Amino acid sequence: MKKVFYLLLSLVITSCVATKNKVAIKNQDGDLVGIATRNDFKKEPFASQWFNDYYEYYQTDPETVTQLKQKLNGITIKGFMGTWCGDSQREIPNFYKLLDESDFDFKKLELVTVNRKKQANGLEKGYNITHVPTFIFYKEGKELGRFVEHANENGTIEGDILKIVSEIPYKHPYQK
């Protein structure tokens, strides 16, 4: 009986450690690495350095947001960003504000924070992340497209995302 208890205890501890490695934690440079949520960015130093101001001052396009409310149904998003990256610091708060105004279900968003080598304890593997931020949009498990680093064709993040989720041909800035 003791052996079974210790075996179960070791399995529980092992699974907790495995899960812990995926949650975003600060590395030696002070950057988050792992799976992050908005709450991570609302803490210091990120809140006062960039998140709160960008979120507050970003003005979305109301007409595009109205269209996105319908188009985002059934969409899941996998995002990659670096807390060290100026483009990520600009786009992540804007992205959250856009999703808030579009009534997006945040259970369908997974955001991975990467280090300066664009690595996150293996969470980035298989996604070919070359620039951050990168948002990958999926419908029924199929990739529809990616928003990479900055707005491209439409001049705003919401314009580019609307094009992607509307399944209109779209190329991000680094796509040939």
Model-derived segments and spans:
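Non-catalytic, surface beta->alpha helical segment in thiol-disulfide oxidoreductase systems
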Residues: 137-173
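Bacterial Sec-dependent N-terminal signal peptides
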Residues: 1-25
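Structural alpha/beta surface segment adjacent to cysteine/selenocysteine redox centers
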Residues: 120-132
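Thiol-based oxidoreductase modules, predominantly thioredoxin-like and allied folds used
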Residues: 79-82, 106-120
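N-terminal leader/targeting and pre-domain segments
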Residues: 20-72
